[in-house]
Amino acid sequence: MQKLIEKANTLMEALPYIRRFSGKTIVIKYGGHAMADEALKKSFALDVILLKYIGINTVIVHGGGPQINETLKRYGIVSQFVKGMRVTDEATMGVVEMVLTGQVNKEVVGYLNQHGGRAVGLSGKDGGLLLCKKLLQEVKNEQGVLETVDIGFVGDVVDVDSSILVTLEAGGFIPVIAPIGVGTGGESYNINADVVAGKVAAALKAEKLILLTDVSGVKDQGGNLLSSIALGDVPGLIEDGTITGGMIPKVTCCTDALTGGVHKAHIVDGRIEHAILLEIFTNVGIGTEIQA
């Protein structure tokens, strides 16, 4: 009986959040270990479908780095990286697009539909969803002078036409986006999935942006999880070394989304089953919330 009462209390804790977020949109970046573990894949699918059933629109943006690496290796293509970004020549871009749109996207869509959802897969090229420009990197040469480096078909989002997403949401569908964009000449670009999620969330004026990661969230210098960060505190946390390394671009993605009109952003440990529900529908949450 006690377990039943605990379940009822959990539902009651979620009720005010369900009321608050019903009819709103949440954009979720799906990547990392959550895409590889079968139990986590199932809990992710069930979380997303439950959100849709209770009236919360969800838009999924997925990654696919490990799958790309595996396929490139099979084709004998060796990748080079500049400041953590893959140099993407024409041959590499062909593989990247094939894997993200033809393999990973369809797997995510299939898994959601298998568990009762109505997911529709698309890339940024569909309906002109993601218009891109070439992303150039600045690196220091041997003399310590900054040089601009062309890293190929790697793009940055300059415009999001969210009309196709609004149409899909209105029809009861769950959009699943592969992070491939299109240039003004029709060329394909590979885009960082976190960036795509943030840009899409801003375009939709989403209630929340959630980044599923392989870490518990942002930690202080003592290793303790920071459950909440104010937007205005982020620059100082980067400057004092609290936010470092690969967490900087994720937090920057969140702050850009907040500046663009998203209400809250969350960095959540995707290795925890039902991480999305735990972050949204509990008073404490499990990750780091960033708010304006």
From Swiss-Prot:
The keyword Isomerase does not apply. Its EC number is 2.7.2.8. It holds the Pfam family AA_kinase. It is found in: Cytoplasm. Keywords: Amino-acid biosynthesis, Arginine biosynthesis, ATP-binding, Cytoplasm, Kinase, Nucleotide-binding, Transferase. GO terms for cellular component: cytoplasm. InterPro entries: AceGlu_kinase-like_sf, AcgluKinase_fam, ArgB, Asp/Glu/Uridylate_kinase, Glu/AcGlu_kinase, NAGK-C. Substrate binds at residues 64-65, 86, 190. GO terms for biological process: arginine biosynthetic process via ornithine; L-arginine biosynthetic process. Coiled coil: none annotated. GO terms for molecular function: acetylglutamate kinase activity; ATP binding. CDD domains: AAK_NAGK-C (cd04250). It catalyses: N-acetyl-L-glutamate + ATP = N-acetyl-L-glutamyl 5-phosphate + ADP. Its main location: cytoplasm. The record marks 29, 250 as: Transition state stabilizer. Belongs to the acetylglutamate kinase family. ArgB subfamily. HAMAP family: ArgB. Catalyzes the ATP-dependent phosphorylation of N-acetyl-L-glutamate. NCBIfam families: argB. This is Acetylglutamate kinase. It comes from Geotalea daltonii (strain DSM 22248 / JCM 15807 / FRC-32) (Geobacter daltonii). The gene is argB.
